[in-house]
């Protein structure tokens, strides 16, 4: 499996977002809130919902999205059969490694849930 984040690994359609929001499991961390839903296809999928209410500046929203995409991309082999929507939580700025570890912890918690 390649480590590219191709189009089929992303949640793109509004219907898919609504389904995950309606039927997904929710887990909150210090920096993230993750909604997840088990799916039949072997590839994991990622959707992002980073609100202006949480991060007012575009630079902060973009940093948050980059961290979420990179964490998902590098660990996608461990996340098979799941769809995720990642949202940012209100928090103070943190280092990338701390935010990455928090998101990884939430992914692992959902998979073993």
From Swiss-Prot:
> What Pfam families does the annotation carry?
Ribonuclease_P (PF00825)
Q: Which reaction does it catalyse?
A: Endonucleolytic cleavage of RNA, removing 5'-extranucleotides from tRNA precursor
User: Does Membrane show up as a keyword for this record?
Assistant: no
Does Nuclease count among this protein's keywords? yes
Molecular-function GO terms, alphabetical? 3'-tRNA processing endoribonuclease activity; ribonuclease P activity; tRNA binding
One GO BP: tRNA 5'-leader removal
Q: Which UniProt keywords apply?
A: Endonuclease, Hydrolase, Nuclease, RNA-binding, tRNA processing
Q: Which residues form the signal peptide?
A: none
- Disulfide bond entries: none
Enzyme Commission code: 3.1.26.5
Please give the GO cellular component terms listed in this UniProt entry: ribonuclease P complex
Q: What does this protein do?
A: RNaseP catalyzes the removal of the 5'-leader sequence from pre-tRNA to produce the mature 5'-terminus. It can also cleave other RNA substrates such as 4.5S RNA. The protein component plays an auxiliary but essential role in vivo by binding to the 5'-leader sequence and broadening the substrate specificity of the ribozyme.
Q: Which family does it belong to?
A: Belongs to the RnpA family.
Quaternary structure and interacting proteins, as annotated: Consists of a catalytic RNA component (M1 or rnpB) and a protein subunit.
Recorded protein name is Ribonuclease P protein component
**What is the species of this protein?**
Vesicomyosocius okutanii subsp. Calyptogena okutanii (strain HA)
Q: What is the lineage of its organism?
A: Bacteria, Pseudomonadati, Pseudomonadota, Gammaproteobacteria, Candidatus Pseudothioglobaceae
